[in-house]
Amino acid sequence: MRLSSTNMQARKMLFAAILSICASSSKKISIYNEEMIVALCFIGFIIFSWKSLGKTFKVTLDGRIQAIQEESQQFPNPNEVVPPESNEQQRLLRISLRICGTVVESLPMARCAPKCEKTVQALLCRNLNVKSATLPNATSSRRIRLQDDIAIKMHVLVGKRFCPWCSSKAERVEFIRESLVVLRMVWVGDSLKNKELE
């Protein structure tokens, strides 16, 4: 019954709109220009959407309103009185968390971790200091050992090369040139060392 009454009202409104368009037209023609066509199409679209999509929009909006109401009911109301059971549960939860923290802190690994970290840092620093202190001595001792080896080998080779029956004159000259090159390299290394010390 209600739907039939709304249909009758819509038809009356549409008929009134058509009559007003006819009355406003200069030549008493129902559809005269583009503006009238657009207005008539717009009125028809409104009536069609209201008839066909009105219930869908209403159901969607009702469902959304109900979902919002359910979500708002899940949040606690600040004006609502909290029951003593929930206060007791929160107190027990805080106590259990505090006990867990003390148990973890009392474990041997938890107690030893900071001490082990400090010990490892101290050991690494000491090793670095020892290596940095012994590095110049090691390089200088290696350089001295290298010079001694070169000198010993030079004496042996010179003794062998300068034997009158072991080598010819050309071989002796070539050996002297090689020896001068080696001595020049040693001299350059010593001069660089002196500059570093200065």
UniProtKB/Swiss-Prot annotation:
Keywords: ATP synthesis, CF(0), Hydrogen ion transport, Ion transport, Membrane, Mitochondrion, Transmembrane, Transmembrane helix, Transport. The keyword Hydrolase does not apply. The keyword GTP-binding does not apply. Its main location: mitochondrion. One of its GO terms (cellular component) is mitochondrial membrane. One of its GO terms (biological process) is proton motive force-driven ATP synthesis. It is a single-pass membrane protein. It is found in: Mitochondrion membrane. GO terms for molecular function: proton transmembrane transporter activity. Pfam families: Mt_ATP-synt_B (PF05405). The chain crosses the membrane at residues 29-49. Belongs to the ATPase protein MI25 family. F-type ATPases have 2 components, CF(1) - the catalytic core - and CF(0) - the membrane proton channel. CF(1) has five subunits: alpha(3), beta(3), gamma(1), delta(1), epsilon(1). CF(0) has three main subunits: a, b and c. This is one of the chains of the nonenzymatic component (CF(0) subunit) of the mitochondrial ATPase complex. This is ATP synthase protein MI25. It comes from Nicotiana tabacum.
